[in-house]
Structures are given as structure tokens and as C-alpha cells.
Amino acid sequence: MADKRAGTPEAAARPPPGLAREGDARTVPAARAREAGGRGSLHPAAGPGTAFPSPGRGEAASTATTPSLENGRVRDEAPETCGAEGLGTRAGASEKAEDANKEEGAIFKKEPAEEVEKQQEGEEKQEVAAEAQEGPRLLNLGALIVDPLEAIQWEAEAVSAQADRAYLPLERRFGRMHRLYLARRSFIIQNIPGFWVTAFLNHPQLSAMISPRDEDMLCYLMNLEVRELRHSRTGCKFKFRFWSNPYFQNKVIVKEYECRASGRVVSIATRIRWHWGQEPPALVHRNRDTVRSFFSWFSQHSLPEADRVAQIIKDDLWPNPLQYYLLGDRPCRARGGLARWPTETPSRPYGFQSG
């Protein structure tokens, strides 16, 4: 029947193989029949509509490449199917080859990077070994080049500053307690006649510059007070309280030492208002090395000896005046002439240490 239909006019009027309808099983190759149904395949000798059991896996491959011989039209479709499959296989193979090339390139790129890192590590080790052999050298702190000695000095100053900050609360606490005891001591001393003049005259250094006239004026000294300004390093104030006397009008005479921001220590004193005819003669000698009166200390602001008097009163007489009051006999003092100032120089400049 297949041969008879091939020669009829209907067969000639049928569309070409590429335009065959999807439902026409006579024009579909074996591979398409398998994909559509999956239950069987067309045998080359079978007629239209006849199905046979599906062959095995090995036979399926041969069947996929063997076209149907019906009407001689399916032979042209089989090569097209095989060609599409071959192109897909070649495209997959080319993609795999490209991936392999990329992986190989990445491997070759990693190897030089590892070699560079190893080379850098080796250079760093060589530099460290060279520095260790060179020994101590200058420290580079930013833009400054400081040797180890200066670096240690900076650290010591930082520790000192930290100690000052830690000491300040303790100083304030015990300073209040100390001022309380000093107030009680002053109350008792002002009721002892001639206490301070006796202490001044018994002091081995201060007695050398007290004249008989100074002794008479110091007999009216009621109380002496030494107070530090805020902090021991900023300055100190000496306050002398007197009873009414025939020599001057002042009830209080103050001598103050203050450390300015520039680091210079300046002194300020109360001007003494002398009664008429009681003003002492010239107080300073020509060579500016000796003085005639203890009260000249209040008007002198440039002589080093004046700072020495302040140092002695602050650090020696004021902390414990009782020890000089109880000495007994007063030492011999210079009379009728110019009394020289003590030659001992304090270990540290005045105004920069605590009493």
C-alpha cells in the first residue's frame, strides 16, 4: 500500500518533509516518535500507525540515527537531527575547554604571587637581622629624631606629671588639716610676749642681720604667718602682724613672691608708713652685698640676699619656731656696723619647693 500511495496525485500534492504536520506519524522520524510517546518506535518496514516495542539502550542509539524509509522523505530529516546534536556536543566541548584554560591561567597567576610574597618575607628577615647587628640607633618619632636618652627623659617627665596629679588631692586634704593645727598654734603664740623676736634672735642666720633698732621693732610682732599660693610652685606669702607701736602705722606688712607665666619670680611688698622721724637711714650698701636693717627686706626686690631671707623663714623658722625660742641664751650678733648676709645658698631656688 505504501508503494501505491507514493505514485498517486495525493502523495505528490502533500507538503515537503519540513512542513509535515505534527500528528502525522508517517512523516516523523524514529527519534521524534520516541520523544513524543516513549512507548515504542517505528520499524522501517512497518506501515503507518504500526508501533513496535522500544529497543534497548544500545538499539535506541542506532534507531535514533536510522531514518524511516517511508516514501523516501524521512531520510532528509535524520541528518538534520544528527547535525543539531553534533553541534551541541561540539559547543559543550568548546565551553569545557575554555573553562580548563581559565583554571590553568588562574593557577599560573597564583604561582607568581606566592613567589613574590616569599621574596618579600625573605627581604624583611634580612632587614631585621641587619638592624640587630647594627645595635642601638636613633629613634624616629614622627618628624623628630630623638636619641634614647631624650626618650627616657620624656618618659620620666610624664611620670612626674602623673605623680603631681595624683598628689594634688592628697595635698588638698592634708593641707586643710595642717592649716587647722597652724591656726591653733598661732592663737597660743600671740599670747606669749616676745616669742617671735626671741626666735629671730636665736636663729643662727637671721640674727646676723638684725640690728638693735630691728630688735626693738620686732618686739611688737604679734604673729607671723607663711602661706603658699594655691600650689607650692606658684609662690608664697609672708604676713607679719604687729601691735600698735611708735615706729610705723602698719598693722599688717605683707611680702609676697609670685611665679609668673614666663617663669620669672617677682616679689611684692607692702609699703611701710613710718612715723615722722622714725624712717631708717639708707638700707643698702654700695656693693649691694650687705644691709643695715631687717626691715629693708620688705623694700628690696632685686637682691639675691632678699630671696635667701625668704627661704630661711619659709623652710626653717616657720615650720618649727619653738625649737629656736627654747634655745636659751641668744648668740652674739654683730653691732655697730654692716651685718653681712649669710653666705649659704639654698639648694633650690625659692618659690619652687614646698615647706
From Swiss-Prot:
What are this entry's molecular-function GO terms? chromatin binding; histone binding
User: What name does the UniProt record give this protein?
Assistant: Putative testis-specific Y-encoded-like protein 3
Stretch list, region Disordered: 1-131
User: Could you tell me the gene encoding this protein?
Assistant: TSPY26P
Identify its protein family. Answer: Belongs to the nucleosome assembly protein (NAP) family.
Q: Where is the composition biased (Basic and acidic residues)?
A: 93-128
Q: Which Gene Ontology terms describe the biological processes this protein takes part in? A: nucleosome assembly
Q: Gene3D superfamilies annotated for this entry?
A: 1.20.5.1500, Nucleosome assembly protein
Q: Which domain of life is it from?
A: Eukaryota
Its GO CC terms are: chromatin; nucleus
